[in-house]
Amino acid sequence: MHISTIPVSDIAKPNAPAAGAWQADDVLALYELPFMDLLYRAQQVHRQHFDASAIQLSSLLSIKTGGCPEDCAYCPQSAHYDTGLAADKLMPLEDVLQAARAAQAGGAQRFCMGAAWRSPKPHHLDEVAEMIRAVKALGLETCVTLGMLRDGQAEQLKEAGLDYYNHNLDTSPEFYGSIISTRTYQDRLDTLARVRDAGLNVCCGGIVGMGESRRERAGLIAQLASLDPYPESVPINNLVQVEGTPLAGTEALDPFEFVRTIAVARIVMPLARVRLSAGRETMSDTLQALCFLAGANSLFCGDVLLTTGNPQVEADQRLLERLGMHAEGALPALPQATPA
């Protein structure tokens, strides 16, 4: 399949190409389109399915920080690396609710809770289920990321009212072994299958800028797009380099390459929420605007994402206003009268 010969109207169809048909070469052909052509195509696809002026706001809270036994080379929460991050116990329910109310007041529609576990223990899952019920009662969509799930655990989360489960693939199968050794790619796919079988929505994306090649970035997007069905929510993270982790000092990704990744994700997963996630704190307003043009329609709001910095809510509000955009659920700003 030579992507450049396929009409935009065909690429935009949810079932075209068929599930499992996306190969890295197909996605790479999109990456290698001229930049303006790629953005034009992505914007066309985006407008077929979404209001291009609306952005979904999500909030992310670390409910259990640090001490993770995994060796993910990018992660400051790994117990394998000395990053100066102290391990905490599971956050009390009332503290979670306080953070959820603050996120809702800031315009967030979805509240995500993350715990630095390899896999949740049964008694921890009971506590997280209570958090889900309480946050859901506020009227927020709920999402959790707790590591690998065993049989029956996704069903327990579903019964508690969970909307989304996040479990990222991180990178392509080919590059994966360079980043993580303590869990396999198949482990991740198995958890995603359990989430789907339980009837939960899937939030699944990855990280770019870890030293991977463009082909390996294409491999990640192809893998995501070939999930059947592809994820409803696709967070794209730009590596945040943390001193003490093996990836500290990695050469930064070209900003235009990050925009290309957003555009390609939009084209091959036309109905997904493509979310700007970690790494946004160092992005200029111009770069973020290009990402919106490329089809990003969700972002994490709030000062901190798990353990890394993030733009302040007020800065996000000002940016959306300058671009004539608005948060989903909020009324668009009225146009200002021009002076006579």
Curated annotation (Swiss-Prot):
Binding site for [4Fe-4S] cluster: 68, 72, 75
Requisite cofactors: [4Fe-4S] cluster; [2Fe-2S] cluster
EC code(s) of this entry: 2.8.1.6
Broad EC category: transferase
Residues in Radical SAM core domain copies: 53-280
GO BP: biotin biosynthetic process
Binding partners and assembly: Homodimer.
Pfam family, one: Radical_SAM
Key words, A-Z: 2Fe-2S, 4Fe-4S, Biotin biosynthesis, Iron, Iron-sulfur, Metal-binding, S-adenosyl-L-methionine, Transferase
Name this polypeptide is given: Biotin synthase
Cofactor binding notes: Binds 1 [4Fe-4S] cluster. The cluster is coordinated with 3 cysteines and an exchangeable S-adenosyl-L-methionine.
GO molecular function annotations of the record: 2 iron, 2 sulfur cluster binding; 4 iron, 4 sulfur cluster binding; biotin synthase activity; iron ion binding
Reactions it catalyzes: (4R,5S)-dethiobiotin + (sulfur carrier)-SH + 2 reduced [2Fe-2S]-[ferredoxin] + 2 S-adenosyl-L-methionine = (sulfur carrier)-H + biotin + 2 5'-deoxyadenosine + 2 L-methionine + 2 oxidized [2Fe-2S]-[ferredoxin]
Residues annotated to bind [2Fe-2S] cluster: 112, 143, 203, 275
Gene from which this protein is expressed: bioB
Family that this chain belongs to: Belongs to the radical SAM superfamily. Biotin synthase family.
